[in-house]
C-alpha cells in the first residue's frame, strides 16, 4: 500500500485518466462508458501504481476494428512510455502483428512456437500457419512474402 495523501492519489488518478484520453470521464458510472472507454479505464487502473508488468487478457474482445486499433496503439504507447513488459493474451492476429515483438504461440496450454512477427510469416509450424492464415488478408500477405523471397 502507499503513504500518499488523498490529494496525491486523486492527482495520480486524474493523470492516468488523462493519459488514456479519459480526462473528462472520472465522474461517469461504468454503464455510461462505451466498450472502448471501459478498456481504457482497465489500462488506467493497471498503470496507476507504475507497474513493471502489464497483463492484458483479450484487450480487444468485443470492440470494433477501429477501436481495437486505438487500444493496440495505447498499449504500445504505454509499454514504451513506462518501459514496462507487457504480456498480451489474444486471438486477434491484427493485434499480434501490430504490437507483438516476442510472440509465444500456445496450443492446448503448451508452448508450440516462439519468435517475432516477421518469423511468424516464415514458419512452417502447421499450427501457427493455420492460425495466422485463417484470415484471407494474412494469406495474401504470406503469398506475397513467399513470392518475394523465392
Q: Can you describe what each PLM-predicted range is?
A:
Residues 121-150:
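C-terminal boundary and immediately downstream tail of ABC-type ATPase nucleotide-binding domains
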Residues 50:
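Conserved catalytic motifs of ABC-family nucleotide-binding domains
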Residues 54-57:
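Catalytic Walker B motif of ABC-type/P-loop ATPase nucleotide-binding domains
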Residues 65-67:
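Helix N-cap at the start of a conserved alpha-helix in ABC-type nucleotide-binding domains
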Residues 6-24:
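Conserved ABC ATPase "signature" region
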Residues 29-33, 37:
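Conserved ABC ATPase signature
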